[in-house]
Amino acid sequence: SGYTLTYFPLRGRAEAMRLLLGDQGVSWTDDEVQMQDWAAGIRDLKKNAVFGQIPRFQEGDFVLYQSQTILRLLARYGLSGSNEREIAINEMMNDGVEDLRLKYYKFIFWDNEANKEKFLEELATQLGYFERILTNNAGKTFVLVGDKISYADYNLLDTLFCVLDLSPTCLSGFPLLSDYVERLGKRPKLQQYLKSEGRKRRPINGNGKQ
């Protein structure tokens, strides 16, 4: 495919893309940049970044920034919905995933451990929304929309991996979400990526907490 993902040696904002690519059997190159090199302006990466941040996606001479934009581009593998309504609903689902992710980021980057109980209460509310969504779609294949996995599923799966690492029992009251994580994690190509050395050696975030 000739895809290159430029990012720090973390899972972070690039991991949902890696889950998607790995599961779809698409090869890519991880171009890892150390944070101190990024800050020092190596290869003019920061200077040339449209909004001063990465991940950066490149295919030939085409360069793209912003994680959700890149994720939607990669959804061209038939992962955005089968009609206009499904496409719109998947966008809505992905926005909901981002709401969940931002609450997680707020806690992991800015809150202290004393606020963990409050965060877990808020997390349970957010998880409840997705449990209800899966309940409504339970007659299909245990994905968020319709009967086929979408980019929103990869983004949700990555976010769930993050919160499970923080609180391993956080899905105990959500049987469909627990099953969702287990089912998707057993998809052969995705499982292969999840067991890869690249995935294992990368911490979730760069702040030393995960």
UniProtKB/Swiss-Prot annotation:
GST N-terminal domain ranges (all copies): 1-82
EC number: 2.5.1.18
Gene Ontology molecular-function annotations: glutathione transferase activity
GO cellular component: cytosol
Reaction(s) this enzyme catalyzes, per UniProt: RX + glutathione = an S-substituted glutathione + a halide anion + H(+)
Broad EC category: transferase
Domain of life according to the entry: Eukaryota
Single Gene Ontology BP annotation: glutathione metabolic process
Keyword vocabulary terms for this entry: Transferase
Tissue: Liver, kidney, muscle, skin, lung and ovary.
Pfam families xrefs: GST_C_3, GST_N
Coiled-coil annotated spans: none
Residues holding glutathione: Y7, R13, W38, K46, Q53, I54, Q66, S67
Domain GST C-terminal: 83-204
Protein family (similarity comment): Belongs to the GST superfamily. Pi family.
PANTHER family assigned: GLUTATHIONE S-TRANSFERASE
UniProt subunit comment: Homodimer.
Role played: Conjugation of reduced glutathione to a wide number of exogenous and endogenous hydrophobic electrophiles.
Name of the protein described by the UniProt record: Glutathione S-transferase P 2
Organism: Bufo bufo (European toad)
